[in-house]
């Protein structure tokens, strides 16, 4: 994500920024832009840094930059992170010091986690970045199962639709290493060209079960090689609806490729809206807090809330003073 504009200077500044915030209790992603723009906030954070290399970056490098070069250096970060944080939905999620959703707990207890990453709601880049962050979090929490005995690890199934939108190195790690931690990955996408080359190689090099429905001729050439001699490119191109070719991995050995029929979408089935509403309501009560509360906390943390509160107090004092003057005037008139 942002690979086309990701340079060594951007990475250097962003890395030291994040390492600095990690040493500050209660820090969030909102601190990335603030530490680069708010000098008082930056001094407060730097004073608590214990890592000499990170501290040296701010004292001996960043603070000694000329303003012109400093603006040039931080502008790409402010642009990219600012775009991400400008969405109220995302800002309210990543602007909280502690998440109310524990993915490791969900994995160990067999909970269901559904994430809506609709591009229409949060934008394409934001959807990709947030999705990549969540998938990486699943990967890290799966790897943390190293402190569990293998027999105690429960299978957890991660389903990712249109996974090319979130394709990062995490996929390669999950496919090659996370299976021993019982994180099972199911991915779906429309055509191979959507995947970066390294991700494509990791997918076809590590995936156990491969299912293909009707594809274009370019994809058919590649996928038919994965299925072996039994399936030719025209077979994949000419498939009808609700049919597929499938290859399984059984006892670490690939099965013979076979064709299968799938079920079409059920007709006339209406979703139970009342039950859906109940599930959402219970989930909100158990795992979330009111949006207004979160936004007020973020406002106060940013310093804007304090200014607004101070302005309100000033107005209140001025109003009270006017009332006192008016009251005194009335008394004089009565006399």
Regions found by a protein language model. Name each.
Residues 115, 213, 260:
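Hydrophobic residues at beta-strand termini and immediately following loops
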Residues 33, 40-49, 72-76, 105, ...:
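Conserved P-loop NTPase motor module
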Residues 1-183, 199, 236, 240, ...:
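P-loop NTPase motor domains
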Residues 130-138, 223, 227, 264:
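Short amphipathic C-terminal alpha-helix that caps PH/PH-like domains
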């Amino acid at each position: 994500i942002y690979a086309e504009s990701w340079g060594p200077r951007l990475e250097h500044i962003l890395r030291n920024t994040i390492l600095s915030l990690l040493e500050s209790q209660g820090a969030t992603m909102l601190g990335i832009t603030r530490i680069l723009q708010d000098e008082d906030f930056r001094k407060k954070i730097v004073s608590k840094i214990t890592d000499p290399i990170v501290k040296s970056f701010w004292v001996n490098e960043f603070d000694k930059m000329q303003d012109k070069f400093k603006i040039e250096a931080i502008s790409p970060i402010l642009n990219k992170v600012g775009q991400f944080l400008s969405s109220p939905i995302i800002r309210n999620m990543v602007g909280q010091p502690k998440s109310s959703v524990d993915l490791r707990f969900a994995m160990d207890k067999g909970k269901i986690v559904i994430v809506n990453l609709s591009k229409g709601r949060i934008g394409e880049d934001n959807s990709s970045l947030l999705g990549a962050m969540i998938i990486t979090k699943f990967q890290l929490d799966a790897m943390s199962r190293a402190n569990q005995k293998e027999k105690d690890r429960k299978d957890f199934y991660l389903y990712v639709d249109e996974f090319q939108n979130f394709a990062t190195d995490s996929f390669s790690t999950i496919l090659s290493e996370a299976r021993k931690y019982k994180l099972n990955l199911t991915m779906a996408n429309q055509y191979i060209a959507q995947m970066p080359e390294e991700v494509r190689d990791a997918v076809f090099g590590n995936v156990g079960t491969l299912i293909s429905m009707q594809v274009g001729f370019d994809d058919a050439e590649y996928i038919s090689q994965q299925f072996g001699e039994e399936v030719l490119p025209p077979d994949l191109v000419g498939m009808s609806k609700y049919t597929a070719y499938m290859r399984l991995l059984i006892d670490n050995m690939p099965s013979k490729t076979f064709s299968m029929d799938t079920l079409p979408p059920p007709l006339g089935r209406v979703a139970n809206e009342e039950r859906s509403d109940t599930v959402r309501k219970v989930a909100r009560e158990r795992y979330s807090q009111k949006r207004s509360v979160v936004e007020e906390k973020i406002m106060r943390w940013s310093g804007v809330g304090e200014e607004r509160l101070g302005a309100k107090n000033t107005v209140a004092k001025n109003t009270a003073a006017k009332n006192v003057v008016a009251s005194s005037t009335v008394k004089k008139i009565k006399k």
